[in-house]
Structures are given as structure tokens and as C-alpha cells.
């Protein structure tokens, strides 16, 4: 009976040691995704989104489909650097 008690405690301890622990890196990945979005302004003439990153202006092309083009000149747009996507029809 004594050996079974030790075995139960031993297996319980092994389960506790082997169970995964949530790390902070999961939270950091989610934070990095949020920090990778940059707001900018649309150019209706060129159908581009110009946003400021690191003190420099970056220009990306908006989509050519009707639901991806700029709505109006100087309309707010958003570039997601993590997913490499631009949204030129972002509501203000």
C-alpha cells in the first residue's frame, strides 16, 4: 500500500512538471501585431496610402477593386505591416 501511495505522488509531480506554462511571448506577439498598424492618408489621384513610420513617409498602393480603392482625397487609410495589407476604406 505504501508503494502505491508513493507512485501516485510521483506521477502527480511528473504531471505538474510536464504541464506547459503560458509564457509572456504570446502576449508580446499580440502586442506586436497591434503595433504594426499605421494610419495614413489616401491619394485619390494615385490610389495610394501614405503613412508615417520611423519619421519617414511610406507609400503603398491601394487595391484596384471598387471596394479597395480610395474613397476620397486625404481619406484615412491604414497599413498593416504584419499582414502586409492596406485598407484604404477605413471608416474615420
Curated annotation (Swiss-Prot):
It is found in: Secreted; Host cytoplasm. InterPro entries: Antifungal-protein_dom_sf, Antifungal_prot. Residues 1-18 form the signal peptide. GO terms for cellular component: extracellular region; host cell cytoplasm. One of its GO terms (biological process) is killing of cells of another organism. Disulfide bonds join 42-70, 49-77, 62-88. Residues 19-34 form a propeptide. SUPFAM superfamilies: Antifungal protein (AGAFP). Keywords: Antimicrobial, Disulfide bond, Fungicide, Host cytoplasm, Secreted, Signal. Antifungal protein that acts as an inhibitor of growth of human pathogenic molds and yeasts. Belongs to the antifungal protein pafB family. This is Antifungal protein B. The gene is pafB.
